[in-house]
């Protein structure tokens, strides 16, 4: 009978272990479909475990607890294989009842995650921790069929993602294709984020553990729940916040390193931006990255900050002795090797770092305020730049308009002077023509009188043929003189018409001058407004010099034009006089042929007298013209000198006026600065008094808080001890109840009694030593409860086996 019971017990125990590993638990047929799928995944994972040599040794071990003398011997003899088997079974039970574990907020889950998730369970646990849904997996198939605008960029960056990993080495291989599909699908899923280079390393780490659909679902949850999508947006607002928080944490927890970084100009973004964008996948190896991802999915972004501080603390002694370039090389090459040398120590250091959530939120608020101020300042700066550009354009337009109006004014003055000169010349010519007309009319009257006298002589005396010929010649001369008088009359009429035209032009020029004067007045008003704006001394000086140079240039051009016109007039008059002299000589020669000797003598004497008279008149005219030109040149030179002196006086007066205004402004600013300094000193004294009062209040409040904290910690410790005591009592009562209900199973009862005795002995020993911390005792009690639950399951299986044998 004893032989059959022992064999059935051992077979039942092994069957129970296999059921736990395979996911076949009691009541499996009543589970929903989602849990059935989870159990199927666990079975697939267990098959992979059985293929491993270590796991096979642990699974097919023939060691049984009932063959051991005491429970203490069984616990120590199991070794690493039993501990690994316990981890596997613990994860299997947690995954079987994942929702229940989350509802109870089982602390064992986070503790197990910190120890490291087994490789074969990692894919399922990551999905459960991230909360990946089936809806994202269904959308993945639709996204693969679509096309993305980022495909070329993704293809370019895939070859640079995990180049040392065998799965991603082959070009256009299954690894690279899977990586491309997942990244493309997420770029279509979240079009605001699209594609960022750092996301490829996170996707590659997920694809090393799970298929494409599951990796896509986990990636979506990572981006949404842990605010990673804000880090990959084009603005990268979350990355800036993380850098600001990390810099403040380094300043608070590692102040000497922060001072060294500030002295070397080593910004936080130079070494930490890739840590947060890729979750340390580009810095550490794959195994360490997987463990960081385990805790990141469980605890969130806070653990990434802890890892960053742990890395800085690991290399602190070396970093304090390096410059900026050497620090960059150290972060890239030496620091990962130091972490890999002591992985558990590194993670324990990271777990030991404490972060205050209130302080982190306060830093986030400070960063948002800083960003808001920066945006306001940038908006104000952009507005001022736009206004400055508009003012510059307006100033340039006003300068161009003023220059154009000044040019127009100068041109108007020049044209007016030219018109005055032309009108003066026309008037002088008109006066000359009138004089010549009077002379010619007087000569015509004399000629008419001579004709009358000659006609009377012809009637009285009959002269010879020679006299008739002479009369005919005199008549011809008179006809020629009449023709010359007619030509002069025509010239006078033409000159009168030209005079009318010139007067019309003068009227038009006067109208233009009025318009120009009105514009000049407007320009003077604009100049007054511009002068009131108080430009810089250099600009004002240049403007004054420009106006003066333009006026000088205009005056010089006017004088040059006047001189040219005078020279042309003199040359034209000289040529005209030469032509008239030649014409008169030719007429004299023609008349001399037909005239008598007596007339020739009289004509010769008359011509000599007239030529002498004309020469004298010409000489006097030339001398007067030359004197007039000399006086005009002297007058213009004097005017230029006067203009220069006036401009210099105006420039000097403007400079003196501006200097006086600047002096007044400087005095006012000095007085304002003195008053401000006094106000600021008074405010500083008030602030110092307030600061001292606040400091004293803060010290009092801090002492009160410390006292309250110690009291609360004492009450918490007492409550924890009470909870642990009640839990141990509960476990003892449950064990005693099971023992009373199952008195037939003698072997199991003995084992349980031995275990209870050992536990009681341990409890008494701990109490006697005084080492009874709440958290450790609670965890040990939980482990003991779990082990007793497993033993109770074994006991139920034994019961079933005995009933089957009896039937």
UniProtKB/Swiss-Prot annotation:
Role this protein plays: Functions as a GTPase-activating protein (GAP). During border cell migration in the ovary, acts as a GAP for Rab11 and is necessary for the maintenance of active receptor tyrosine kinases at the leading edge.
Domain Rab-GAP TBC: 116-300
Quaternary structure note: Interacts with Rab11.
SUPFAM superfamilies: Ypt/Rab-GAP domain of gyp1p
Protein's UniProt keywords contain Coiled coil: yes
Transmembrane segments: none
Coiled-coil residue windows: 352-463, 494-583, 627-772
InterPro entries assigned: Rab-GAP-TBC_dom, Rab-GAP_TBC_sf, Rab_GAP_TBC_domain
Protein name as catalogued: Ecotropic viral integration site 5 ortholog
Residues with Phosphoserine modification: 58, 64
GO molecular function: GTPase activator activity; small GTPase binding
Compartments in which it is found: Cytoplasm; Endosome
Gene3D superfamilies membership: putative rabgap domain of human tbc1 domain family member 14 like domains, Ypt/Rab-GAP domain of gyp1p, domain 1, Ypt/Rab-GAP domain of gyp1p, domain 3
Pfam annotation, one family: RabGAP-TBC
Region of interest: Disordered: 1-31
GO CC annotations, alphabetized: cytoplasm; endosome; Golgi apparatus; vesicle
SMART domains per the UniProt record, alphabetical: TBC (SM00164)
Main location group: cytoplasm
Keywords, in A-Z order: Coiled coil, Cytoplasm, Endosome, GTPase activation, Phosphoprotein
């Amino acid at each position: 009978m004893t032989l059959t019971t022992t064999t059935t017990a051992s077979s039942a125990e092994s069957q129970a272990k296999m059921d736990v590993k395979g996911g076949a638990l009691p009541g499996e047929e009543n589970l929903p479909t989602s849990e059935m799928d989870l159990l199927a995944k666990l079975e697939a994972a267990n098959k992979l475990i059985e293929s491993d040599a270590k796991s096979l040794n642990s699974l097919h071990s023939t060691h049984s607890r009932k063959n051991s003398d005491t429970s203490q011997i069984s616990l120590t003899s199991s070794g690493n294989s039993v501990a690994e088997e316990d981890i596997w079974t613990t994860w299997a039970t947690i995954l079987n009842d994942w929702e229940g574990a989350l509802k109870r907020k089982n602390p064992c889950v986070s503790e197990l995650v910190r120890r490291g998730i087994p490789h074969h369970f990692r894919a399922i646990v990551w999905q459960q921790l991230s909360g990946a849904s089936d809806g994202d997996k269904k959308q993945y198939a639709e996204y693969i069929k679509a096309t993305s605008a980022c495909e070329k960029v993704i293809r370019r960056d895939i070859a640079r993602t995990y180049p040392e990993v065998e799965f991603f080495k082959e070009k256009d291989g299954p690894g690279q294709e899977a990586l491309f599909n997942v990244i493309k699908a997420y770029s279509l899923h979240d079009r605001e984020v699209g594609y960022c280079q750092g996301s490829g390393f996170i996707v590659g780490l997920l694809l090393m553990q799970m298929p494409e659909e599951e990796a896509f679902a986990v990636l979506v949850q990572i981006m949404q729940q842990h605010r990673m999508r804000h880090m990959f947006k084009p603005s990268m607002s979350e990355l800036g916040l993380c850098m600001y928080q990390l810099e403040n944490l380094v300043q608070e927890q590692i102040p000497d390193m922060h001072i060294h970084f500030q002295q070397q100009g080593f910004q936080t973004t130079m070494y930490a931006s890739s840590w947060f964008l890729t979750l340390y996948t580009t810095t550490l190896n794959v195994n360490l990255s997987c463990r960081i991802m385990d805790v990141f999915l469980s605890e969130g972004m806070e653990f990434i900050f802890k890892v960053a501080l742990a890395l800085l603390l690991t290399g602190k002694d070396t970093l304090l002795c390096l410059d900026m370039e050497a620090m960059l090389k150290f972060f890239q090459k030496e620091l990962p090797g130091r972490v890999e040398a002591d992985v558990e120590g590194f993670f324990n250091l990271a777990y030991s770092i404490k972060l205050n959530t209130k302080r982190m939120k306060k830093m986030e608020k400070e960063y948002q305020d800083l960003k808001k101020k920066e945006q306001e300042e940038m908006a104000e700066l952009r507005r001022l730049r736009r206004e400055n550009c508009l003012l510059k354009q307006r100033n340039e337009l006003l300068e161009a308009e003023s220059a154009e109006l000044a040019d127009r004014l100068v041109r108007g003055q020049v044209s007016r002077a030219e018109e005055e000169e032309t009108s003066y010349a026309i008037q002088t010519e008109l006066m000359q023509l009138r004089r010549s007309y009077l002379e010619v009319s007087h000569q015509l009257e004399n000629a008419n009188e001579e004709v009358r006298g000659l006609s009377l002589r012809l009637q009285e005396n009959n002269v010879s043929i020679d006299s008739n010929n002479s009369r005919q010649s005199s008549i011809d001369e008179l006809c020629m003189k009449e023709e010359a008088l007619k030509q002069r009359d025509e010239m006078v009429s033409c000159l009168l018409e030209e005079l009318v035209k010139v007067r019309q032009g003068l009227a038009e020029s006067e109208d233009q001058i009025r318009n120009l004067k009105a514009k000049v007045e407007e320009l003077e008003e604009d100049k007054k407004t511009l002068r009131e704006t108080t430009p810089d001394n250099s600009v004002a000086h240049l403007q004054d010099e420009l106006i003066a140079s333009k006026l000088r240039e205009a005056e010089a051009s006017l004088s040059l034009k006047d001189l040219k016109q005078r020279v042309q007039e003199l040359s034209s008059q000289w040529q005209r006089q030469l032509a008239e002299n030649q014409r008169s000589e030719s007429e004299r020669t023609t008349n001399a042929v037909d005239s008598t000797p007596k007339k020739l003598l009289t004509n010769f004497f008359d011509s000599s007298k007239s030529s002498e008279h004309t020469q004298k008149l010409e000489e006097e005219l030339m001398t007067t013209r030359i004197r007039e030109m000399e006086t005009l040149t002297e007058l213009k030179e004097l005017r230029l000198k006067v203009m220069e002196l006036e401009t210099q006086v105006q420039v000097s007066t403007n400079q003196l006026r501006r200097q006086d205004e600047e002096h007044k402004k400087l005095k006012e600013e000095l007085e304002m600065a003195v008053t401000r300094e006094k106000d600021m000193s008074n405010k500083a004294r008030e602030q110092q008094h307030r600061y001292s009062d606040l400091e004293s209040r803060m010290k009092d409040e801090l002492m009160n808080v410390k006292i309250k904290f110690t009291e609360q910690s004492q009450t918490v410790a007492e409550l924890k001890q009470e909870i642990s005591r009640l839990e141990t009592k509960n476990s003892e009562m449950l064990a005693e109840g099971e023992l009373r209900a199952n008195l037939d199973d003698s072997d199991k009862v003995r084992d349980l009694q031995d275990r209870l005795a050992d536990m009681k002995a341990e409890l008494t020993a701990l109490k006697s030593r005084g080492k009874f911390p709440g958290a450790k005792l609670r965890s040990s009690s939980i482990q003991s409860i779990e082990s007793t639950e497993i033993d109770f399951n074994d006991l139920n299986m034994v019961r079933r086996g005995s009933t089957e044998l009896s039937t």
